[in-house]
């Protein structure tokens, strides 16, 4: 639906500014998640008052084409009629029970049916909770303590995962946040993404002690960096060889890049490819607080109440969240959904690239399904160190120019973007036109 009575964008941000000042007095940094504060790009955060389709309106009634989509969940756009109807119906039956519901079973059935590697799942309330629980389960199932993660991959803010690489190859990591004791991360080995030699050495040195290797198959907190096919294949082979579990963090990519997640994309190039465990979130909740982790029956049956690995949650499987998630999953299974979504997203990236190239501005981008990223670089990076070479001040200028044109990208250089089925060809054209004007004057 095309909104009517759109106000022109103006530099005045009276209500946004006032709300931010009020918030800073009571909420640390004025926000409830750091990236929202615009600290990386400067300026005043936009306080959203409503959203519909591909758009949101801020507190000053300025409209924006939204390429964040709640950081990925809104694959259908905001306020999709079928999802809204499902949530409204669920609300009439009660908000939360602390007891099992039929919708929990239905959602689990859908997830297991759609993701071939899943035999059982456990529902939780956030991606952080899912990743944290998956690691605990991997350790419990294998009887091992050490885990592998990769520099630049984000798996939530659990203590054991807030870690950066140590001082040498195949050394254990150091905390990236105050409040995380060094001993908490002493079992976390941090490797360079897409670095085969480091991967080989880590398993050669520690293979018998490694419980799991956790990886974002497409790293969305490096903007958009794919694990190469040879690298992913070797991850699978080494985990199998040493008895470690391969854990796919698909909180961002699950149902966002393909119906079966990123693992289904890799399975096209690696015959029989499956992770042992998968972490899901975002799209499966349709914008509600809902996530999941799952895997083989043998591993998942180690969870309480069947097994010795404890995990619990008061709001896990919330009836309103599961209604929202089920409605979303049903919509994205309609014929042609991902073909159209992928085509629209590729069109956006191609348009931005062409506009930058025409102006002689270094630029490259990539996408899969409804997820995309771009860099002010000459070629796509393969690891975090290369991502860090992107021109930060230039990105900040781009961000604010697009914002002034009514286009809302992530207010940080290292975050992926998202296209929804609600984005129209006109939205993409308007976005590319705004970018072309910026690049021409850069």
From Swiss-Prot:
GO molecular function: glutamate-1-semialdehyde 2,1-aminomutase activity; pyridoxal phosphate binding; transaminase activity
N6-(pyridoxal phosphate)lysine: residues bearing it: 282
Catalysis: reaction(s): (S)-4-amino-5-oxopentanoate = 5-aminolevulinate
Principal subcellular localisation of the protein: cytoplasm
Biological or metabolic pathway of the protein: Porphyrin-containing compound metabolism; protoporphyrin-IX biosynthesis; 5-aminolevulinate from L-glutamyl-tRNA(Glu): step 2/2
InterPro entries in UniProt: 4pyrrol_synth_GluAld_NH2Trfase, Aminotrans_3, PyrdxlP-dep_Trfase, PyrdxlP-dep_Trfase_major, PyrdxlP-dep_Trfase_small
Key word Cell membrane present: no
One cellular component (GO) term of this entry: cytoplasm
Biological process annotations from GO: protoporphyrinogen IX biosynthetic process
This protein's UniProt keywords: Cytoplasm, Isomerase, Porphyrin biosynthesis, Pyridoxal phosphate
Localization of this protein: Cytoplasm
Domain of life: Bacteria
Signal peptide (from-to): none
Cofactor: pyridoxal 5'-phosphate
Gene3D superfamilies assigned: Aspartate Aminotransferase, domain 1, Type I PLP-dependent aspartate aminotransferase-like (Major domain)
EC number: 5.4.3.8
Family: Belongs to the class-III pyridoxal-phosphate-dependent aminotransferase family. HemL subfamily.
Assembly, per entry: Homodimer.
PANTHER family: GLUTAMATE-1-SEMIALDEHYDE 2,1-AMINOMUTASE (PTHR43713), GLUTAMATE-1-SEMIALDEHYDE 2,1-AMINOMUTASE 1, CHLOROPLASTIC-RELATED (PTHR43713:SF3)
The protein's name in its UniProt record: Glutamate-1-semialdehyde 2,1-aminomutase
Gene (name only): hemL
């Amino acid at each position: 639906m095309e909104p009517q009575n759109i106000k022109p964008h103006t530099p005045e941000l009276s209500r946004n500014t006032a709300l931010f000042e009020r918030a800073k007095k009571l909420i640390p940094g004025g926000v409830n998640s750091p990236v929202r504060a615009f600290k990386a790009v400067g300026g005043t955060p936009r306080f959203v008052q409503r959203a519909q389709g591909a758009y949101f309106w801020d507190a000053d009634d300025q409209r924006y084409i939204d390429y964040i989509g709640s950081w990925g969940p809104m694959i259908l756009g905001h306020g999709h009629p079928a999802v809204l109807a499902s949530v409204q119906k669920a609300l009439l039956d009660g908000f939360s029970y602390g007891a099992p519901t039929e919708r929990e079973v239905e959602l689990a059935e859908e997830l297991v049916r759609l993701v071939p590697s899943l035999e059982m799942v456990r529902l939780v309330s956030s991606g952080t909770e899912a990743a944290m629980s998956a690691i605990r389960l991997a350790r419990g199932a294998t009887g091992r303590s050490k885990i592998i993660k990769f520099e630049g991959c984000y798996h939530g803010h659990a203590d054991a995962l807030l870690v950066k690489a140590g001082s040498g190859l195949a050394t254990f990591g150091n905390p990236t946040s105050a409040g995380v004791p060094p001993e908490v991360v002493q079992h976390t080995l941090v490797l360079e993404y897409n670095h085969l030699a480091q991967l080989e050495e880590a398993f050669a040195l520690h293979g018998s002690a490694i419980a799991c290797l956790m990886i974002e198959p497409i790293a969305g907190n490096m903007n958009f960096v794919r694990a190469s096919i040879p690298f992913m294949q070797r991850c699978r082979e080494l985990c199998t060889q040493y008895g470690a579990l391969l854990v796919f963090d698909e909180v961002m990519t699950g149902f966002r890049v393909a119906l079966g997640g990123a693992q289904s994309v890799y399975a096209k190039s690696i015959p029989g490819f499956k992770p042992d465990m998968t972490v899901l979130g975002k799209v499966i909740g349709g914008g509600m607080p809902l996530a999941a982790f799952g895997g083989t029956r043998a591993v998942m049956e180690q969870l309480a109440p069947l097994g010795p690995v404890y995990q619990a949650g008061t709001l896990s499987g919330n009836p309103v969240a599961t209604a929202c998630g089920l409605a979303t999953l049903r919509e994205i299974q309609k014929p042609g959904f991902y073909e159209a979504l992928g085509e629209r997203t590729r069109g956006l990236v191609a348009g931005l690239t062409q506009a930058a190239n025409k102006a002689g501005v270094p630029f490259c981008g990539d996408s899969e399904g409804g997820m995309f990223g771009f860099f002010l670089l000459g070629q796509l990076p393969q690891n975090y160190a290369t991502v860090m070479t992107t021109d930060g001040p230039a990105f900040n200028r781009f961000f604010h120019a697009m914002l002034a044109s009514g286009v809302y990208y992530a207010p940080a250089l290292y975050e992926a973007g998202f296209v929804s089925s609600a984005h129209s060809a006109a939205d993409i054209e308007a976005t590319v036109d705004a970018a072309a004007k910026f690049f021409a004057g850069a």
